[in-house]
Amino acid sequence: MSSGVREACESRKYNAIVLLGGGEPGFIESREIARPYGIAVTACGFSQMHFATMLGNRFSVIDLSEVHNMHYYDLVIKHRFENRCASIRNINYPLPRPPYSGESQVHLAKNKVMRGEFSEIMESAIHESVSAIEEDGAEVLILGCSALFWMKPILQKRLAELGLEIPVLEGYSSAITLAKAMVDLGVSSSGLTYPGPHDKKWRRKKLF
């Protein structure tokens, strides 16, 4: 990841870099690498959480497995949204990982839904979304794993049919839109948050 980001920065061909993965592997390192080049770096969870807090008071995450739930919990803490995150709701359809194999149940569900067929996974996502709203106080929903991002328009439509006018965000469009906004604003990352190894000025004290 870091070598690819460095190569992209050194090529001077890009104004921004978008990391497409719900779990944000290498995001902090990529921002640190890109900052001296003035290149914005965005990632899915980071972008969704920031947009979500502009749209409502609290958001909930619709996610697919225990292991990813806990990883996403760490992202919520890392990005300092623990006071704005109402809950992480788990539909419990893990992606196949070694030593397990076979086609993803989520991928099969997507094909079913696109054919207009019933999908238990889709219904689980709707059920957990309603619970997040009615029980947890969520006012915005975000999708945790990139394997679920295809659900956004269907989830939005089904919730609206239930009378729940709530924004649903997915990571790809959020990360790309934020990257464009940062380029338009002419900003990347703060040099005080991501300092270089030999910055000209240094701070004697940091307050958090």
Which role fits each region the language model picked out?
Residues 1-16, 131-137, 156-158, 165, ...:
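Metallocofactor- and cofactor-centric catalytic cores in central/energy metabolism, strongly enriched
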Residues 2-51:
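Glycine/small-residue-rich loop that forms an oxyanion/phosphate-binding "nest" at active or ligand-binding sites
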Residues 9-10, 118-133, 194-208:
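Extended, charge-rich low-complexity interaction segments
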Residues 11-21, 138-146, 169:
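Periplasmic-binding protein-like
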Residues 19-30, 64-68, 144-150:
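Gly/Ser/Thr-rich loops at beta-strand to alpha-helix junctions
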Residues 31-55, 157-176:
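Short, acidic/small-residue loops that bind anionic groups at enzyme active sites
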Residues 53-93, 180-208:
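Short, glycine-/small-residue-rich phosphate/pyrophosphate-handling segment
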Residues 75-144:
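Active-site rim beta-loop-alpha module in soluble metabolic enzymes
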